[in-house]
């Protein structure tokens, strides 16, 4: 049996919407938001009414009767750490998101928009595999200093979706397989998936693991500490050095990997060094996750937008295919992943979880 499900993915400069009937897309639309449109809002929460109007306009434009919906799902935002799965949107979840209790991000609006429409229609609302999915084994939380623990913040939705898809293609269940999965995008996260659980992963948001097009990844601690007390930067500026203006931006002045790759192919030495270093760091992280799984790995999976780059993935494959086979699952279809999670619950194949 198939179900009509509306999927909502609010990003920092866009709102992506789609209605599915089972695994069939009835319609999909991405609405881009200009800096001018967003300039009047002081924070993400103030954008709620604006995004709500966008949602209603899109539904009306496609002539879809929302009364046909059987569920609404939003992208999960910054919440307390939870295990992977599909979660009912509750008042407690909404309260935490409204207060930005665990951080502020456009994805916080996903559950809020989903619940508003679902409540009007008296149907359930969900989120699926939010970025705060935390299934790390306890030994992986130990950082090296007792005052701070390692955190699990990564591209959980795409990691889990890629794992499920490849497991199915290999004729098995995600929950019965071991993968090392690398999400390659604006941020990069590399995780050890052991029988359906992400037992170790770099914190792709807060400065851990490989550098990416716009994030610094792990930095030499003492040098960064010196920068913190140099008086040259504010706390906000230092944070931007880690997330937003780190990685390729700091080396080459751009976060566009298309531009970087063009420079590499034109023989730009500086671009080649940075490009090779990023592939090297991703490969090294894959190797580390292979140790976490004690070498018992069914496949290495490369996913995310950068997995479309044959040049970039070839450099990773050269350095890691001695471990096991490397499978490329390019792109990230977050709307499809959100829908799949809800379809499984509505069909009774999986039980929803409560926040």
Curated annotation (Swiss-Prot):
Reaction(s) this enzyme catalyzes, per UniProt: butanoate + ATP = butanoyl phosphate + ADP
Alphabetized CDD domains for the sequence: ASKHA_NBD_BK
Gene3D superfamilies cross-referenced by the UniProt entry: 3.30.420.40
GO molecular function, one term: acetate kinase activity
EC numbers on record: 2.7.2.7
InterPro entries in the record: Aliphatic_acid_kin_short-chain, Aliphatic_acid_kinase_CS, ATPase_NBD, Butyrate_kin
Entries under SUPFAM superfamilies matching the protein: Actin-like ATPase domain
Keyword annotations of the record: ATP-binding, Cytoplasm, Kinase, Nucleotide-binding, Transferase
UniProt cross-references to Pfam families, sorted A to Z: Acetate_kinase
Enzyme class, spelled out: transferase
PROSITE patterns: ACETATE_KINASE_1, ACETATE_KINASE_2
Swiss-Prot/TrEMBL GO biological process terms: acetate metabolic process
GO cellular component: cytoplasm
Subcellular location: Cytoplasm
NCBIfam families per the UniProt record, alphabetical: butyr_kinase, PRK03011.1-5
HAMAP family noted in UniProt: Butyrate_kinase
Family to which this protein belongs: Belongs to the acetokinase family.
Protein name per the record: Probable butyrate kinase
Organism (species): Listeria monocytogenes serotype 4a (strain HCC23)
């Amino acid at each position: 049996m198939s179900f009509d499900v509306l999927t909502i993915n609010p990003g920092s400069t866009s709102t992506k919407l789609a209605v599915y009937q089972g695994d069939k897309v009835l319609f999909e639309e991405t609405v881009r938001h200009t800096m001018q449109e967003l300039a009047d809002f002081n924070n993400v929460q103030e954008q709620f009414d604006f995004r709500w109007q966008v949602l209603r306009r899109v539904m009306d434009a496609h002539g879809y009767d929302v009364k046909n919906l059987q569920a609404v799902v939003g992208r999960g935002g910054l919440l307390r750490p939870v295990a992977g799965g599909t979660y009912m949107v509750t008042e407690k979840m909404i309260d935490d998101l409204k207060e930005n209790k665990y951080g502020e991000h456009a994805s916080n609006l996903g559950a809020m928009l989903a619940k508003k429409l679902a409540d009007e229609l008296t149907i359930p609302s969900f989120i699926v595999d939010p970025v705060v999915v935390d299934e790390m084994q306890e030994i992986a939380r130990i950082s090296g200093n007792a005052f701070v623990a390692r955190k699990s913040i990564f591209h959980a939705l795409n990691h889990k979706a890629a794992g499920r898809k490849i497991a199915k293609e290999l004729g098995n269940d995600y929950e019965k397989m071991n993968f090392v999965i690398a999400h390659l995008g604006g941020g990069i996260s590399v995780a050890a998936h052991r029988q359906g659980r992400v037992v170790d992963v770099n914190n792709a948001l807060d400065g851990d693991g490989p550098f990416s097009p716009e994030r610094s990844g792990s930095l030499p601690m003492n040098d960064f500490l010196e920068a913190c007390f140099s008086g040259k930067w504010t706390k906000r500026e230092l944070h931007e050095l880690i997330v937003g203006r780190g990685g390729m931006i700091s080396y080459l002045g751009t976060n566009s990997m298309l531009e970087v790759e063009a420079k590499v192919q034109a023989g730009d030495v500086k671009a080649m060094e940075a490009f090779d270093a990023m592939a090297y760091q991703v490969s090294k992280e894959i190797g580390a996750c292979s140790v976490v799984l004690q070498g018992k790995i069914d496949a290495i999976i490369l996913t995310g937008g950068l997995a479309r780059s044959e040049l970039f993935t070839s450099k990773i494959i050269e350095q890691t295919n001695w471990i096991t086979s490397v499978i490329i699952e390019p792109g990230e279809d977050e709307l499809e992943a959100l829908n799949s999670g809800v379809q499984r619950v509505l069909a009774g194949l999986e039980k929803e979880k409560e926040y």
